[in-house]
A protein has these predicted regions:
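Selective transmembrane helix interface/packing segments
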Residues: 1-187
Length: 187
């Protein structure tokens, strides 16, 4: 029972941290205004990890490589802690190549979950409270993902099914990535 609770807590903490780091990289790529209150909160939560890493890896023109590296390192730590909680030990040397690859798939899983929740939040807010102060940020973050789907889907006269299509797509991809990630590392 304690291992289940420990695994649950490790999953929550590292998934949230990794997802916030991915969102930080995404917001950087979209050039969202850094003084946005949501961006400021994200920076405050993640600066303890990103700022020291920035001495080693600089942010690029388009991608914040430091935040992506920090998210990947969070995934590595998550997988190691999960293995230790479940088995009581972890042989890092024999499992290192698979661990590093599984961390990539874990980051992909977190990315797909982030897309799912942001699109769902934007869709719900557009129905419930379209004038919400967070809607401009949500629109700017989801537009690059939804616009290609909108171009393919037929116009239904005010009914936008692109969020539904993207939600289904992310769930299917998340199932595939999760299966691959957990088959790589014997946890």
């Amino acid at each position: 029972m304690f291992s289940e609770v420990g695994l649950f807590l490790v999953n929550i903490v590292f998934s949230l941290l990794g997802t916030i780091l991915l969102l930080r990289a995404w917001v950087y790529a979209l050039r969202v205004h850094p003084f946005n209150p949501y961006s400021q909160a994200m920076f405050k939560v993640t600066d303890w990890l990103v700022v020291p890493l920035r001495r080693l890896v600089k942010a690029g023109r388009f991608w914040d490589w430091t935040s992506l590296l920090a998210s990947w390192l969070s995934a590595v730590a998550y997988l190691i802690l999960s293995a230790v909680i479940l088995t009581g030990s972890f042989d890092a040397l024999s499992n290192l190549p698979m661990l590093l690859l599984a961390a990539v798939f874990t980051v992909l899983r977190w990315t797909l979950s982030l897309v799912f929740w942001i699109v769902l939040l934007q869709a719900l807010l557009s129905w419930i409270q379209p004038q919400s102060p967070s809607m401009p940020l949500l629109r700017s973050v989801t537009a690059p993902l939804l616009d290609p789907i909108r171009r393919v889907l037929p116009d239904l006269g005010g009914l936008d099914l692109s969020p539904l299509v993207l939600l289904l797509l992310t769930q299917v991809l998340n199932m595939v990535v999760t299966r691959v990630a957990f088959s790589l590392v014997p946890i």
